[in-house]
Design a protein with these regions (language model features):
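Short, solvent-exposed loop/hinge segments that bridge or flank secondary-structure elements
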Residues: 25-26, 31-65, 69
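Short, exposed beta-strand-loop hairpins at the edges of beta-sheets
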Residues: 104-106, 112-126
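Short, solvent-exposed mixed-charge patches
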Residues: 130-132
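Contiguous, well-ordered beta-strand patches that form the walls/edges
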Residues: 59-109
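N-terminal signal peptide c-region/cleavage motif recognized by signal peptidases
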Residues: 15-19
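Bacterial N-terminal signal peptides that target proteins for export
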Residues: 1-7
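Hydrophobic helical h-region of N-terminal Sec-dependent signal peptides
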Residues: 8-12
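Boundary at the C-terminal end of the N-terminal hydrophobic targeting segment
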Residues: 20-24
Length: 132
């Protein structure tokens, strides 16, 4: 299994746990709530990235088990709830290669999550859901 980068880590958002259903994770997510308007739009009642979204804070769009970032697309393959975190394995593609990645998610408040990875170095990143 390959190690992950912070963008791939974002795929954690579609996990299901006892406290959170996948449908509850659907939406637009970013590391900076003040950047929501610069990153996301709705086209035909569907969330989409604005043209220059990658110039602003990191973000992604979650629809069920599908997660779309500005440069990658992922599909959740497996979930394991250990009580305090949900461990996820996802298959991600950057348009050139496909790889499996592993990471954890913790619900840190209403419309807030913290994504973490232990490899290649420990990384922990908070995300907030944009109201769209």
């Amino acid at each position: 299994m390959r190690t992950i980068n912070p963008l791939v880590l974002l795929t954690l958002l579609v996990m299901q746990s006892a406290s959170t259903q996948a449908a509850d994770m659907d939406g637009a997510w970013t590391i900076d709530a003040s950047a929501c308007a610069q990153m996301f739009t709705k086209e035909n009642n569907k969330l989409a990235f604005k043209q220059d979204a990658d110039l602003h804070a990191g973000g992604l769009i979650v629809r069920g088990k599908q997660i779309t970032g500005t440069f990658q697309k992922c599909t959740v393959k497996s979930l394991h709830d250990d009580g305090s975190n949900v461990q996820v394995i996802a298959s991600c593609s950057d348009g050139v290669a496909v790889s499996d990645v592993a990471f954890d998610i913790k619900i840190s408040g209403e419309n807030r999550i913290t994504l973490s990875s232990k490899e290649p170095v420990p990384v922990e990143m908070p995300y907030v859901r944009c109201s769209m």
